[in-house]
């Protein structure tokens, strides 16, 4: 009997493969970074070939390092950076342009022209706010600006995919062109009520329906990995979820009202809203969490574009630390931020502000400011952005938050988690397994093939590592929040003409 599930976790800065056993324990991890390209101000691109080659490499490397054979692999699950957009020639498999990354802002002005007339309609159909973040305007840009792309599309020879779709296309040698609702719901072309691609939205963005993948559930067999990549050609690809929805599932937030925050490149807070779509009055997004069988689960989401990535900037741009981990020890040498506030909106503000023209701001600097104050303000800036989303979410659901679960690379920082708990004045719960995004994809794949019988069996595997409880006096929190709000106002509309 097969003993393992492999999760392919394709992220914004690296491709990873993680092998899990039946207990949900990590057997092996392989990871490779790949470059991001910034050809113009506000543009962010990846090479589709680099995404595929690094993902294939880490999958094969993980299998080799774990010394397992193809018959030991029960299935593969895929989780991915969402919204990132690729178009390729169906006949040759060659991309017609680079992958336009979710962080890319080139279509901001175009999105602005649509907001007044179409904003309400798009919000009602998709649960999303018109923004360059989502795939629709990126597809439109490629079709309008890349020579030959529109002609290929009209002939039916062009394929669109988010990263999950591209990887499955490559793994199956072009035999399978699919996605799942968690990814489709991030394109701004998918109606989350009918669970179908929406003809009115496709017409608005002038996108031919023929280029789109088939939308299947998040947990079923889509196809098999070609024997060129795993010998035998019998390993099923059986689970798909966008990274944030996968983390919600991996955290076993499977009951209505449960929430998690992922501290990755960005920060993404999701609350399970069950089988009901909660329409936000506070600039949050309604999205599909997953679909298993015929049952659709929805979520309320708030995301900030720069979370853990700001620590990379402090390391590589500001150069006041040599390693990302060093920010914790540096920040811990001071008791507070010394009046310094860092709003790390380098690529604009996401929820709940949705300001495409905001830019990163460090404010409150004096002659007494040190690198340690800036380090602490960096960690606080991450936590305070998350605070603003939680307060918006509480208004939408009419309930106060008592705790939430955390994951992602930066959640390993005890100092950041303590700051987060202090600002919230409620408990932060960190699980033993932080690889919850990959674990969610593994669980979805395993459920499809009977590796696990149901979510109740899986839920028993979730284990708490530690809980962070608030230590900061409420009056000090109020002071921090007052100045944080002033700093946010300073960062807003910075480059608006």
UniProtKB/Swiss-Prot annotation:
ADP binds at residues 12, 16, 265, 308, 409. One of its GO terms (biological process) is glycerol catabolic process. SUPFAM superfamilies: Actin-like ATPase domain. One of its GO terms (molecular function) is ATP binding. It comes from the Bacteria. Keywords: ATP-binding, Glycerol metabolism, Kinase, Nucleotide-binding, Transferase. Pathway: Polyol metabolism; glycerol degradation via glycerol kinase pathway; sn-glycerol 3-phosphate from glycerol: step 1/1. It catalyses: glycerol + ATP = sn-glycerol 3-phosphate + ADP + H(+). InterPro entries: ATPase_NBD (IPR043129), Carb_kinase_FGGY (IPR000577), Carb_kinase_FGGY_CS (IPR018483), FGGY_C (IPR018485), FGGY_N (IPR018484), Glycerol_kin (IPR005999). CDD domains: FGGY_EcGK_like. Its EC number is 2.7.1.30. ATP binds at residues 12-14, 265, 308, 312, 409. Key enzyme in the regulation of glycerol uptake and metabolism. Catalyzes the phosphorylation of glycerol to yield sn-glycerol 3-phosphate. Belongs to the FGGY kinase family. This is Glycerol kinase. It comes from Dichelobacter nodosus (strain VCS1703A).
């Amino acid at each position: 009997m097969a003993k393992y599930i492999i999760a392919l976790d394709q992220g914004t800065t690296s491709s990873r493969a993680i092998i899990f056993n039946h207990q949900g324990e990590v057997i092996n991890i392989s990871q490779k970074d790949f470059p991001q390209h910034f050809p113009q101000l506000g543009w962010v691109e990846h090479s589709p070939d680099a995404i595929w080659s690094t993902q294939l490499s880490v999958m094969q490397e993980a299998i080799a390092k774990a010394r397992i054979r193809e018959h030991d692999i029960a299935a593969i699950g895929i989780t991915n950076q969402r919204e990132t957009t690729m178009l390729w020639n169906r006949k040759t498999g060659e991309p017609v342009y680079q992958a336009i990354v979710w962080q890319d802002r080139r279509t901001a002005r175009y999105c602005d022209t649509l907001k007044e007339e179409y904003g309400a309609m798009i919000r009602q159909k998709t649960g999303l706010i018109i923004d360059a973040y989502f795939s629709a305007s990126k597809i439109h840009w490629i079709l309008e600006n890349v020579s030959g792309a529109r002609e290929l599309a009209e002939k039916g020879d062009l394929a669109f995919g988010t990263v999950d779709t591209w990887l499955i296309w490559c793994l199956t040698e072009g035999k399978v062109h699919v996605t799942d609702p968690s990814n489709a719901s991030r394109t701004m072309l998918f109606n989350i009520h009918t669970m179908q691609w929406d003809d009115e939205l496709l017409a608005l963005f002038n996108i031919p329906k023929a280029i789109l993948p088939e939308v299947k559930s998040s947990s079923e067999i889509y196809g098999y990995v070609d024997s060129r990549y795993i010998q035998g050609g019998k390993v099923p690809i059986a689970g798909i979820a966008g990274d944030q929805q996968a983390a919600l599932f991996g955290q076993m937030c499977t009951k209505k009202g449960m929430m998690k925050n992922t501290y990755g490149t960005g920060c993404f807070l999701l609350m399970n809203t069950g089988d009901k779509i909660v329409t936000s009055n506070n600039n949050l997004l309604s999205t599909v969490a997953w679909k298993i069988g015929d049952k659709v689960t929805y979520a309320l989401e708030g995301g900030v574009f720069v979370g853990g990535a700001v620590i990379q900037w402090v390391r590589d741009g500001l150069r006041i630390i040599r390693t990302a981990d060093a920010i914790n020890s540096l920040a811990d040498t001071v008791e507070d931020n010394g009046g310094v506030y860092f709003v790390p909106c380098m690529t604009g503000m996401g929820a709940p502000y949705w300001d495409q023209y905001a830019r990163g701001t460090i404010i409150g600097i004096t002659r007494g400011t040190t690198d340690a104050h800036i380090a602490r303000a960096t960690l606080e800036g991450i936590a305070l952005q998350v605070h603003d989303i939680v307060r918006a979410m509480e208004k939408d659901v009419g309930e106060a938050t008592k705790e939430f679960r955390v994951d992602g690379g930066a959640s390993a920082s005890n100092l950041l988690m303590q700051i987060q708990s202090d600002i919230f004045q409620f408990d932060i719960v960190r699980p033993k397994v932080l690889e919850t995004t990959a674990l969610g994809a593994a669980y979805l794949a395993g459920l499809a093939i009977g590796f696990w019988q149901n979510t109740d069996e899986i839920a028993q595997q979730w284990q708490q590592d530690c809980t962070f409880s608030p230590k900061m006096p409420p009056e000090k929190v109020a002071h921090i929040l007052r100045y944080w709000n002033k700093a946010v106002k300073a960062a807003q509309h910075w480059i608006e003409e």
